[in-house]
Amino acid sequence: MSFFSNLRAVNKLYPNQASFITDNTRLLTSTPAGFTNVLNAPSVRNIGNNRFQPGYQLSNNQFVSTSDINRITRNNDVPNIRGVFQGISDPQINSLSQLRRVDNVPDFNYHTKQTRSNAVKQNFPETNVRTPEGVQNALQQNPRLHSYMQSLKVGGTGILLATGGYFLFSAATLVQDIINAINNTGGSYYVQGKDAGEIAEACLLLQRTCRQDPNLNQSDVTICPFDPLLPNNPPELTNMCQGFNYEVEKTVCRGSDPSADPDSPQYVDISDLPAGQTLMCIEPYSFGDLVGDLGLDWLLGDEGLVGKSSNVSDSVSGKLMPIILLIGAVLFLGLIFYFIYRYMMKGGGGGGVGAATSPTPIVISMQNPTPTTAPR
């Protein structure tokens, strides 16, 4: 089995430590260089009711769970990979890319889009909105984005989103198109990677989505025909959202996050799924999330991010220019005084070296001619 298949297999709770040690031995046979120093130190945490959470004991005595190892390696979360696998090299981290491609792991694309969306909402807070008024205001503050999206609407071609739905241009206005796309996001998704994980096919798991947008248009969203873990619709699935409280749980899903606290209703065991498949909860989009999903963050700002960077440079240059001019003036005056001093030293009064070396004047004596007496 491949590295990510073996890593997925240990992403579950165990009845005892010995069972995990056995599975981890199999994992080590497929572990690439740079990662064995951590995976060679298996450990467990007793979380009660004969359940043991598997993981690894780091050199600083910190415990990291197998679910966290799965999450950071599948997401290509380089900062956290470096934090866990101390001293790992760039080539060793890059080796995971090929292993992900072998198993069609799709997670890293979602992680990249989520990271981009978070940056959009942080740097341009006006995009963190879900109302028509908020979207209109965000478009007005970002004219390049507005112009580009308007051109997309003129083209009329729908765009597939990470949630499996489409950004369609069928409403009377661009703002309403955006609101419709936002309303069709949020929930539990079953994701299957294709073409080395570069393409992801996602569908919405309605029975694991405990809070749907009231304006969700199911005809514009791909609904899963069955549940990949509970295909026979047992009571465990049909009753999953009983007692759901969004204000307490702060998420729209249950049974959709393999990295969640095992005692929370959000946790799910996906260890039986192939490495190229996963379940994930995606919270309802804001306009900023939509911009990040579409990869249009480069258009934000009055002149886009590039123009914004140029404006920052111009601002810095403007502040430094008076200082630069002052320094230049001082240097110029100093140069003038230097030449004046040199001139005075060379061409000044007698004495000294100058007098000793001055050339001797040439004196020309003019004599009257001697008269001659003519013979008489």
From Swiss-Prot:
GO cellular component: membrane; viral envelope; virion membrane
Protein purpose: Structural protein that plays a role in the first steps of per os larva infection.
Organism: Autographa californica nuclear polyhedrosis virus
Similarity comment: Belongs to the baculoviridae E56 family.
Keywords assigned: Glycoprotein, Late protein, Membrane, Transmembrane, Transmembrane helix, Viral envelope protein, Virion
Pfam families in the cross-refs: Baculo_E56
Superkingdom of origin organism: Viruses
Lineage: Viruses, Viruses incertae sedis, Naldaviricetes, Lefavirales, Baculoviridae
Cell location: Virion membrane
Stated name of the protein: Per os infectivity factor 5
Record-annotated membrane-spanning stretches: 154-174, 320-340
UniProt keyword annotation of Transmembrane helix present: yes
Additional note from the record: Expressed late in infection.
